């Protein structure tokens, strides 16, 4: 069992700022998206056996470059997720990750968390030339409305060293579709 609690608050000075979606000082001051929360950051049960890791509870999930799924770790209240996850390391070069999430604990503290029905799938294959990743992130806020945001993508990244310089390279393509009460939209990223 692992647990971690966090507390962020003003020690000196005043609270002359606004925390966007939490409703704190709305419209009165500049937005600083760092509320003063005291909350459980992580609390999960974990099972590990050879290549399999299972977690159930509140956990940090950061996939690939954090572009679509990450903890937003530069904020005072990092993003965590409630749910179950499984990572299976098939071999030294292949691993697969799956998570079902029923809550996104966002950076704005508990007042702005989302109940959700999210599925995260991420698979990696490492070669001498680099790492190939395929993913599907199927996000849905659990509020009885059509609001799905589905992201499907592939990513390739690697590095190369010369005698004096290290080089990193990467390419990514993702397609995103959104289903909401106002209609369907689609976007592509590369």
Language model regions located:
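A short linear-motif detector with a strong N-terminal bias
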Residues: 24, 33-34, 63-66, 75, ...
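Signature for the C-terminal beta-barrel architecture of outer-membrane proteins
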Residues: 50-54, 72-190
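Outer-membrane beta-barrel and related beta-rich outer-membrane complex signature
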Residues: 13-17, 68, 110, 183
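Beta-barrel outer-membrane channel/assembly domains of diderm bacteria
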Residues: 1-61, 84-90, 94, 154-170, ...
């Amino acid at each position: 069992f692992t647990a971690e609690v966090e507390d962020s608050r003003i020690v000196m000075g005043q609270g002359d700022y606004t925390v966007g979606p939490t409703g704190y000082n709305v419209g009165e001051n500049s937005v600083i998206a760092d509320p003063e929360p005291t909350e459980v950051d992580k609390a999960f049960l974990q099972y590990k056996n050879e290549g399999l890791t299972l977690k159930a509870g509140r956990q940090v999930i950061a996939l690939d470059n954090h572009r679509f799924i990450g903890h937003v770790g530069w904020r005072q209240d990092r993003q965590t997720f409630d749910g179950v996850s499984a990572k299976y390391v098939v071999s030294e070069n292949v691993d697969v990750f799956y998570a079902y999430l029923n809550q996104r604990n966002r950076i704005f503290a508990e007042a702005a968390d989302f109940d959700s029905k999210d599925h995260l799938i991420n698979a990696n294959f490492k070669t001498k030339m680099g790492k190939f990743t395929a993913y599907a992130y199927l996000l849905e806020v659990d509020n009885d409305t059509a609001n799905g945001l589905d992201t499907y993508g592939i990513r390739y990244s690697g590095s190369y060293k010369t005698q004096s310089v290290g080089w990193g390279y990467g390419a990514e393509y993702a397609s995103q579709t959104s289903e909401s009460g106002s209609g369907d939209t689609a976007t592509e990223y590369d």
